[in-house]
Amino acid sequence: MEDFVRQCFNPMIVELAEKAMKEYGEDLKIETNKFAAICTHLEVCFMYSDFHFINEQGESIIVEPEDPNALLKHRFEIIEGRDRTMAWTVVNSICNTTGAEKPKFLPDLYDYKENRFIEIGVTRREVHIYYLEKANKIKSEKTHIHIFSFTGEEMATKADYTLDEESRARIKTRLFTIRQEMASRGLWDSFVSPKEAKKQLKKDLKSQEQCAGSLTKAFRRTSPALRILEPMWMDLNRTATLRASFLKCPKK
């Protein structure tokens, strides 16, 4: 699974995910599902904000990277991906500048056009179930919630989807591509079935121990433990390099 993540996501996103897991004392080689989920969530947050700017009239506009007007103010401030200290510093700065109510939990983005914090969710379950879980945790009408699924569904506070349809379609397409790539590698079933993932992981680890003496076989195949994706963890720069990660994952 770790190999898949490193092939599928941009190195900058992978590095941010590694730092996040290290900050919370988590081992990405053991919690490979969380590693994949964090990378997915980070990429959705970047895609959410990408190309969106605010012009001099305060209107939201979409600008392609080659456009000379790229120096316009970014519509979204990305909070996700920063270490906790820096993230809270950014949140406090936004609150002091805009007068926004300080959230109890760290949000993912701030929308300068709508003047609100945004919580992004990516789920492999029913979107309405995950939305309710998020809303129950946050307990604030000030933070806007937007949930995406790997099946193309989405749900947002008061059905206000913030972005235009084309921008949201890009995110949905990327999530669907990730799902297809996982499925092609036999990872998707264990990704959506926690019990099966744990059962298969134990089986493969036991198999590894029995085959430890066979170095030739070990070198010729991928470690079974790396093929298992455990249950998904639910939950700066905007560069051309980051945008390259939105392309389809390479096949092995």
Swiss-Prot record:
Domain free text: The probable endonuclease active site in the N-terminus and the basic amino acid cluster in the C-terminus are important for the shutoff activity. The C-terminus acts as a nuclear localization signal. The C-terminus is recruited to host protein complexes involved in nuclear Pol II RNA processing.
GO biological process: viral RNA genome replication; viral translational frameshifting
Site (Important for efficient shutoff activity): K202, K203, K206
Domain of life of the organism encoding this protein: Viruses
Catalytic site positions: E80, D108
Protein name per its UniProtKB record: Protein PA-X
Family that this chain belongs to: Belongs to the influenza viruses PA-X family.
Function: Plays a major role in the shutoff of the host protein expression by cleaving mRNAs probably via an endonuclease activity. This host shutoff allows the virus to escape from the host antiviral response. Hijacks host RNA splicing machinery to selectively target host RNAs containing introns for destruction. This may explain the preferential degradation of RNAs that have undergone co- or post-transcriptional processing.
Localization per record: Host cytoplasm; Host nucleus
The entry's keywords: Decay of host mRNAs by virus, Eukaryotic host gene expression shutoff by virus, Host cytoplasm, Host gene expression shutoff by virus, Host mRNA suppression by virus, Host nucleus, Host-virus interaction
Site (Important for efficient shutoff activity and nuclear localization): K195, K198, K199
Main localization (coarse): host cell
